[in-house]
Amino acid sequence: MTTCDVLVIGGGVIGLSIARELRRRRPNARIVLIEKESSCGAHASGRNSGVLHAGFYYSPDSLKAKFTRLGCEQLTAYCEQKQIPLNKCGKLVVAKDAGDLKSLDELFRRGQANGIELQELTDIEAKKIEPRVKTYQRALFSPRTATVNPLLVVNAMQDDAQREGVQILVDTAYVGKNDRRVRTTHDSIEAGYVVNAAGLYADKIAMEYGFSEKYRILPFKGLYLYSNEPPGSFRTNIYPVPDLRNPAFLRA
């Protein structure tokens, strides 16, 4: 049986980041991370758009706005430190019709309140950034938004975590718990603390520990359409004005 001070469940960006930070704060602690797949980042952390969002979608008094801004700054610095290719192409937010202009103004206000650099553009100015963009009268441009290959980030974090002394056990899935012991597909692990970073299954594990009784994770799958144009055909990311009631959902 394995014993540790802290067990982290889940080898995505969140789990790896937490494990590294715990190791930094408690250098003498034994930190173990388990990942059910054969490598870290095999799910959402390694299969996403790789956009480092600047943080102007969310209400400025929210933790999400704060952490998005700080996360963009810190992850940009991490990529530069690790020499991970970073495309600082920015992002255009475009309006479909007159009904989007009020929301566009609200996004600009949120950006200012949260200390995010944003530029208000006319449709003509937007076309200077991306000639093929279509917008109704106005657009917003976020120069701080960038894109990166998410798997390169995960791989770098995994290498750093292991070098810093975190024990990573791949092909090791969480099965259940018995008091202080966590059962996995290979062995039992006795841990002083358990950190639940299990992604889309985090709610199920949380319920076994007496949490998340009133919450459920509702997964959504994003679909990508590929064109036959060569990479780099567009100069920047182009996003529609989101539904500000829930910015995670983009309107077509």
Regions found by a protein language model. Give the residues of each.
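Beta1/beta-strand and adjacent pyrophosphate-binding region of the FAD-binding site
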Residues: M1-I14, V32
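Conserved Rossmann-like nucleotide-cofactor binding loop
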Residues: I14, S39, Y201
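Flavin-dependent oxidoreductases
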Residues: S17, T184-A252
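Gly/Ala-rich phosphate-binding loop of Rossmann-like dinucleotide-binding domains
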Residues: A19, R23, D160
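Glycine-rich FAD pyrophosphate-binding loop
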Residues: R23-S45
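Short loop/edge segments at beta-strand edges and connector loops
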Residues: E35, K88, T122-D123, V170-T172
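Dinucleotide-binding Rossmann-like beta1-alpha1 core, especially the glycine-rich loop
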Residues: G50-E125, I129, Y136
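Helical element adjacent to the flavin cofactor pocket in flavoenzyme catalytic cores
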Residues: A139-Y193, A197, Y201
